[in-house]
Each structure stands twice: as structure tokens, then as C-alpha cells.
Amino acid sequence: MNICLFLPEEIGMPLALKDDRAEHILKILHKKTGDTFTAGIVGGASGTAKITGITDEGIFFDFTASGDGKPLYPLKMIVGFPRPIQLKRLLRDVAALGVCEVHLTGTELGEKSYMQSTLLEKGNAYKMLFDGTVQAGGTKIPGIFLHKTLSQCVSAVCGSRQENQADFSAPAAGKILLALDNVRPSQSLGDALGRFHGNLLSRGVVAAIGSERGWTDKERDFLAQSGFALCSMGCRIMRTETAATVAGAIILNEMGVMGNDERQN
């Protein structure tokens, strides 16, 4: 737990001793009255909390904001619904990277039963995103969305074909659309990103990653017709959650955000 996150209404209220955050503060960090710890407001500012007292009622603290909570980056990820255990790791990792949205979608080769997973119920998926955000020391939690089909997903995420393109000669206007595919790629992911000459951060990127069995030819055709460039990350076949994390890191590095020192946030 690299930051202790609170809802806005929790600021100014004692933190119950049985709360997981309180146990971390007292048993892991070994904090006592007068000490400080890194804290933040979910979706808001980050800063420092100073413990003003510890009683049976809980931990009393004062919060002082000092940072913006590490804003999320303009990278949206479309992911063919993976196995639930893979999805847990995927959500934690992409949240830690700072992806702004995760769109889970059914695919032609995807296992339909995965979409019925209880991971999407009772806030379990949100908890994975929350954990990844805390790991990164941020306060902004990525959005998560579920779509029955790839067509519905692309329509919801990308809008019209005219507003987005993978055309490298196109003006810096719409989102940059990239689909990971090791069967029929037109170029490598690195080459595709390199062609945008610094426009990645201003335009934003949508990266699509298939389920564990990949895309069908019909889906590849649909993605290409929708403006996605089919890109490879080499000849090695990766698990869905690995591909999502690796692709996210490569894209964010090309955006120029991976080298920025955000410790003050």
C-alpha cells in the first residue's frame, strides 16, 4: 500500500481500527500519534495525513493536499475477456500503469462463460483497479466497461470511423487506433508508434488485445475497416494479461510519460 486512499466523506472522520488501511498504518508502517503517511482522496488530490490521535474510536488525522494524484494517461485498452484469474492480474497491472479506461469485450474465440464471472459483481473488478492504483501511489482509478461484442465495444470506445484513424498521413485529430495481432500484422507496434512523431499524448491511443485464442479473420477485417492498424510485438505468443501490460508500457513509453518523475504527486 503505497498510498492510503479515502473517500471525500471520510476526510475529517476517524479511521476505524479494524479497517484494512488502519491495520496497515499501525502494523506495517508502525505509525503513531504525530507521524505522517502518504494519503489521497479517491479521484482527487494526493498529499500527507498527520495522525493527531489514536483511540478506541479509530485513527484521527488531518489531511493536507499537495499533489494532483497522478492523472491517468490517454490510453484506452480494449481486451477480449480473459480467464478470471488473468483478469485480476491484468486489471491491477494496467491500473498501476495509469491506463484511463479498460473495455472488456466478448470475442468470437473467447470463452463465453468468462463473461459471467463473479469478478464483475460486487465491486471485485473495481477492487483490482483500486489495488493497482494504490500500488502506483495514485488516486485516479481507471474506468471499466463491459461489452457483449467487439462491434459494440469499438462503437462505444471509438465513435465514428471518420473521427479516428491509423492513417499515418492523417492530421493529428482523432485517436490513434492499434490492434495487437501476431497472425496478420502490417507492422510492429514500435514502428506504428514511431510514425506519429510526438502526437501520441495529444491524440490519445486505443489499443485492442484479443482473448487468449486471439482474433478471427473476420475480427481482423473488422478492426482494419474500423481504422485500427494491426501490429505485432514479436513472434512470441503471450498471455492476454502479459500482452496488455507489455503493450501498455510500450505505448506509454512512446508517449513520453514513463520517464517523468511524478514522486511529488
Indicate where each model-derived feature is located.
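Short Gly/Pro-enriched loop/turn and capping motifs at secondary-structure junctions
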Residues: V183-S186, E212-T216, I237-M238
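A C-terminal functional module that forms or caps the active site or interfaces directly
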Residues: V205-K218, F222
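Structured adenosyl-cofactor binding patch, chiefly the S-adenosyl-L-methionine
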Residues: D217-N265
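Short loop-to-alpha-helix "cap/lid" segments that border enzyme active sites
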Residues: D167-F168, S186-N199
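RNA substrate-binding interface of SAM-dependent RNA methyltransferases
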Residues: G69-L178
